[in-house]
Amino acid sequence: MQYLISSLIFLIPSLGMLAGLSAAATVTIFLLISFLRGINRHCERLQGVWQSSNNVIPWLDHGIQKIQKDWIPLQAHGITMLFTAWCFISCLFAIHLINSLATFTQVFILLFLGFAVSNSAPFQNRLQLKKALIFGILTAILLFFIEYSSNGFLTRIFKTSFALYMLDRGCALLSITAWVAIIILLSNGKKRHTLMLYILVLYLLSISDSLASFLGFGIGGVIFILTRFMKPIFFKLIAISLITGSLLFPVIAKQIEPQDLSEKYLATQPSAAHRLFIWHFVANKIIEKPILGYGLASSKYIKAGDSEMIDYNGEKWHPLPLHPHNNILQITLELGIIGLILFLCLVYKYLKQISNLENKNFKAISYACFINYYIIGMISYNIWQIWWISSGIWVLVLMKLLVKPDIVIDN
């Protein structure tokens, strides 16, 4: 089982570069194997207890103490359970009930599995697993440059054509996974290697087609530095900025003039221009159902009339293709203001948990990775996409079970 975990830790970032959607499958397998590992360890411990009757009572006492200890964190998950409950309730008045319930079930099972694994015992043989992760990331970087310089040599083995945007998901996965490797190197005193890896990944993202990943990783680096130099007030600063910006975003999206902005600043970037039109359209739709929203996973079923279609430089664009390409707008559109408030409460909660970490480097990297993931979600991807949720859980599990046990006393 240890070999399987090591192989998957290497495979997820490397295979993910060529096929980003593969993370939905590979991370799920990784979580299932890790979950079974925890069950096996528990069964072995239980078997050892029953072999010696003298150990039964102490083991029961320990179990009761553990339940009492874990009950406090369980109570602290009240806001999480409220958000989950509201997501389920929103399915009941969604545009497409069956699809919404199916999406909710998939996301809930994946998040529950990720939560269970991330709160299990740390990995054994962590040095070997850390090496596997770093080699996996380096392999992903190598594969990107092979595809970039050869016009998709490997991709064209399986597909008829290649375009650089096909690596966007892999770049997004790399941008958040690289932070795990960075903290591993930094905690081992390899500052030069840390800087080299950051610059290499930043350069890779700058020549890729994934602007969201480049911005997320670049701003993540700035966040890392600010965390180290603004220790006393950084949590308040980042929390206020994120929450205020998120609350104002739907208002700003409503007020913008996408046609004028696109012609002035985005004439050569049609993809970015299209997003402005999408955000403006979504903001107007939010006004129609501001409190409850349209229901979870309803974005792609919202109809647009002929008069709402976008005519941009002779091209016809749909004002809402599948999803809003912005997590805040999608949450507000589908779950309403109620869902947005609950979501931002979760954001505050996780930022507060990061601020409570004692290790300075681990805290700074955690902030950077969180902001990286958040920014990508503000520009790209459906918030309910399984591969993207899996990517976030993957990094969380690595940080908690692979990195944290060696450098942080859990406070």
From Swiss-Prot:
Q: Lineage, please?
A: Bacteria, Pseudomonadati, Pseudomonadota, Alphaproteobacteria, Rickettsiales
Q: How does it sit in the membrane?
A: Multi-pass membrane protein
Query: Would the keyword Hydrolase be found if you checked this record's keyword annotation?
Result: no
Q: InterPro entries under this entry?
A: O-antigen_ligase-rel_domated, WaaL-like
Query: Which family, according to UniProt?
Result: Belongs to the O-antigen ligase family.
This chain's protein is named Putative polysaccharide ligase RC0486
| GO cellular component terms, A-Z | membrane
Q: Which UniProt keywords apply?
A: Membrane, Transmembrane, Transmembrane helix
Which parts of the chain span the membrane according to its record? 15-35, 78-98, 101-121, 133-153, 166-186, 207-227, 233-253, 328-348, 361-381, 383-403
What would be one Pfam family of this protein?
A: Wzy_C
Spell out the subcellular localization from the entry. Answer: Membrane
